[in-house]
């Protein structure tokens, strides 16, 4: 392992092979930026997601406008995971929470000793799930698996093989690693390109610093009739009022309390969002409604969307599970999960998409996990 770490230090000074798993908004932005930094980028996605893969292959790379501009080449975009992983020094898994395990399982037969994998963003302790999917115990150090608290970009695909980057974050993207003793190694590797990364204490911190489960289900629920109605509206500009903001604040305070119970300092979302470049005010209503970082984002056209299925079905479920283990009430988080489940006609908590048990951690106490992670 020491030899692998020594070689990583050299990688910062030379061209690396960087693999990107995924072909969504964030994956294209990550591929663009690492190619722009002079590295050889290889992209993989599953065969059913071939639209962007075909476009990138045809163009030979990715076009971008906004905060990152121009064209950057991609060495390979396709469905052969072995081609992407072979000899890759750095591998990013970029996608929603439900993509983490499939990506890990796809990598399992081809992962090489000493490789670094980064789940970006973690969403819900993604590094642990990814390591499980590789078939490795969380304490195994034959490969390094990290995750981040959020994406380094606000980005949308605006045409096949083309993205618009609205915000390239300048800070506030937390990074944690399994094993935690290797976090400095991964941080030093990422920092020259992803300048926004900051060191987290552990995987719990990257999980809880992600505020999407606080934001998206709440705003969606309090605007459910508008979403199901005939007219479009702007999700943040029109969807966040003073009343909505009060509920956001209550949920955020419970998220911060979860972190405190684990010995972690979790920043309020308005505070870290200012550092990230999303907000210009530190409050829970006008900050979101008037923020240039959220301007022009239309609401989803149906409730059956990732704001419920991912952010509640994975995120809030994990928060409630952690609270149960810690003996915390978090009444607003629990109420939100119950209401969302009723709206969708399904029991997200009973589905257990993401819990300590499904992460393979049921045999550990919280005290043991804090020591291991």
Give the label of every model feature segment:
Residues 22, 45, 95, 121, ...:
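Short beta-strand/turn micro-motifs composed of small residues
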Residues 97-161:
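Rossmann-like NAD(P)(H) cofactor-binding subdomain of soluble oxidoreductases
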Residues 6-8, 231, 238, 245-373:
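NAD(P)-dependent Rossmann-like dehydrogenase/reductase catalytic/cofactor-binding core
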Residues 68-110, 115-118:
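Rossmann-like NAD(P)-binding element
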Residues 1-15, 96:
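N-terminal amphipathic/basic-hydrophobic helices that include classical n-h-c signal peptides
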Residues 11-66:
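NAD(P)+-binding Rossmann beta1-loop-alpha1 motif at the extreme N-terminus of oxidoreductases
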Residues 137, 147-194:
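Internal, well-ordered alpha/beta segment that forms a basic, Gly-enriched binding/recognition surface
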Residues 171-271:
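Active-site-lining helix/loop region of Rossmann-like oxidoreductase modules
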């Amino acid at each position: 392992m020491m030899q692998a770490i020594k070689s990583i230090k050299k990688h910062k000074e030379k061209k690396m092979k960087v693999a990107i798993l995924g072909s969504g908004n964030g994956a294209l932005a990550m591929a663009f930026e690492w190619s722009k930094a002079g590295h050889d980028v290889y992209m993989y996605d599953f065969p059913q997601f071939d639209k962007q893969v075909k476009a990138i292959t045809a163009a030979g790379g990715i076009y971008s406008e906004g905060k990152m501009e121009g064209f950057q080449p991609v060495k390979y975009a396709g469905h052969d995971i072995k081609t992407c992983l072979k000899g890759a020094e750095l591998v990013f898994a970029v996608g929603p929470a439900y993509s983490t395990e499939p990506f890990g399982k796809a990598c399992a037969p081809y992962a090489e000793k000493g490789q670094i994998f980064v789940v970006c963003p973690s969403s819900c302790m993604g590094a642990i799930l990814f390591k499980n999917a590789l078939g490795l115990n969380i304490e195994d150090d034959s490969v390094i698996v990290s995750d981040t608290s959020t994406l380094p970009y606000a980005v949308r695909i605006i045409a096949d093989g083309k993205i618009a980057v609205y915000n390239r974050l300048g800070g506030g993207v937390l990074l944690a690693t399994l094993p935690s003793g290797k976090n400095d190694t991964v941080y030093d590797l990422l920092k020259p390109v992803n300048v926004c990364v900051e060191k987290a204490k552990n995987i719990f911190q990257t999980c809880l610093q992600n505020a999407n489960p606080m934001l998206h289900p709440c705003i969606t629920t309090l605007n459910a009739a508008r979403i199901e109605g005939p007219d479009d509206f702007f999700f943040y500009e029109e969807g966040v009022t003073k009343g909505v903001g009060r509920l956001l604040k209550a949920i955020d305070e419970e998220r911060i309390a979860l972190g405190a119970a684990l010995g972690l300092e979790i920043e309020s979302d308005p505070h870290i969002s200012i550092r990230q470049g999303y907000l210009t005010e530190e409050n829970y209503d006008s900050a979101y409604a008037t923020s240039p970082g959220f301007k022009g984002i239309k609401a989803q056209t149906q409730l059956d969307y990732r704001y419920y299925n991912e952010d509640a079905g994975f995120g809030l479920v994990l928060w409630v599970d952690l609270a149960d283990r810690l003996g915390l009430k978090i009444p607003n988080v629990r109420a939100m999960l119950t209401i969302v489940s009723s709206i969708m006609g399904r029991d997200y908590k009973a589905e257990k998409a993401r819990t300590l048990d499904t992460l393979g951690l049921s045999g550990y106490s919280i005290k043991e996990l804090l020591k291991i992670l």
